[in-house]
Amino acid sequence: MRLPLILALSLAIVPLGRALAQAPPTPALPAGTATPPMAPAAPLAGTGDFHIVWEVKDRFRLFRNDADFLRLAAASRGDGVLAAEDRLERATDGLGWAKDVVANLCLDNFGNLEETCERDGVRENYLTPIDHPIGVTISGPAPQDASCVWSFDSGNGPSQQTTVPCDQEVKLRVPSGRTTVASVDIPLGDGTAQRVSTEIAVRDVLVAGLGDSIAAGEGNPDKAVELDGGFCFKRFLSGGFSQYFRPSRAGYDDDRSCENGPSSPTAARDWDRHGARWMNPACHRSLYSYQVRTMLALAIEQPHLAVTLVPLACTGATIGAGMFAGQRADDCPWVVGIETCSGTAPAQFTELRDVMAAVHRQDPKRNLDMVLLTIGANDVNFAGLVANVIVDATTERILLKQGGAIASVDDATKSLEGDLPDEFSQLRTALKPFVGGNLDRVVFVSYPNPAMQAQDKPCPGGRDGLDVHPAFGADAERLRAAAQFVETKFLPGIRALATCEGNKACRNPTTDGMTFVDGHQAEFVQHGMCVRASSDPEFDRNCFLTNGNSFQTDPNAAPDNPMACGEPPSDYKPYAPRARWIRTANDSYFTAMTYPEGMPAILKPSDIHDALWGVLSAVYGGAVHPTAEGYAAMADAAVPAVRGVLGLQAPPAVQA
């Protein structure tokens, strides 16, 4: 592991306006949007209206480029993550902002953290930076055309001095874990000068993100799949097979028909190349996740903070297979020169131990400040509950039952009340060493109920939003029972386990209880997967029909355009604002089109034309997960809890 060789302050004087003007172009945001201003520091000396203002640059350290951070900060007006997400979605015409950022993260080609990362031209140790970039300026009516004399003393050598125009920002790097005193002599109109000083101390918080698909951001690839004309699927039935067409991945040039037998390995690789892109493909980690959005929001609102996020959450994780042991990979990334992947993802606790070992090799005193966590749904086989509700056809239900992919409410209840308490006990024991023995530094963000359209009113069932596969159709009674289980048993049960309510398998409730977040659940009640509004995207209103007849059945017309409405599939806007905050099966296919990897042999599709993968793609690949707006609402609920754990104050605009 290589460390940056910057052992002293390095000065770069850049006018603030010019520095921002050099950022890459970005889609225009609504009028009135502005980057949050730098926060003033309380002066140590001096009088009058002058004070020193400073901020950490590129303070969300997962980003390589400060320009990316500034673009996202510009969408924030202090009114929450959801409001900012709405502005970003409109500014990008519903195509998403993360597609322009995902290639510029401190991650390798497989989505794993790089210990050494080049950020804005400087190689840094991602986990243990020795210094931080900051910008310093003067707030107050400085004389025009005057020059100010700055000095910076970090206590490890001679102070650094520079003379610049008073209206210019001074950019420099200050040592980590050390206070730097900044002073400036400001000329006054009477020929004298006023000295103003302040202390600069960057706080760098180290946060791990753990858990399952809800923690990872499933359903929302950083770059959504691009769509075009029809692609043939062959559905095997008891008496033979049938064919139907759905949108293809744009750019896929191999055979789209079902007439020429199984697809070749070359065709499969070409199919992979044109899939969605994820921050981490094996685990479907996404920049849209509530964990990323929470810590990004904190970095935006706290100018003196640097945020070092370690994202480890993984779709499909259970406490046993995912946290303590490895699990199947959700996807296999296509990387030039690598033709195969292992089909597995490592245990999150193993990864976290490796991360902290790397941290302590460089800085034995640096520890985790906090853990973000969501886990437990897969332990009660929530995906099996989803399959039980939406898979209506006999052939597919039999196959999924044989593969263990169907679960009833009774099955889920037995797991919730039987095995899960002991598993949570093991989870608490494993987490404690990472957070100093007290689990109040673990922020557990709970699940939303995905199947509600209003208070005490579950979605009605049917094929609305589910007709991407002929086998889908939500059974109304099974849906009602599942929604009731989530509302009355699962969510209260998870809360009790996380917080030690009723001493649920907690040896010491004072140290075993986690900080719990569920404020978003009330908001999701009116934004379930069946909710529609006149403000929904035009494609949704015209082409996703409530009667379940969204797709072309004419075998002559479907290869060119599989949509019954006649509009091209490419008009679908994966990240446009919607009334529903839960992805439907249609949304999942049109946004991610996940080809599932690591499945049991009985459930493994024969090739890319096998309609079985369409079932698995919905059940395991994003359906019944929050949209980007839903994850943003979860982040809004989490931010106050995170501030409390880290001992941070809300900015004045939020307090007001």
Which residues fall in each region the model found?
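Conserved SGNH/GDSL esterase-like catalytic core that processes O-acyl groups on lipids
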Residues: G230-S415
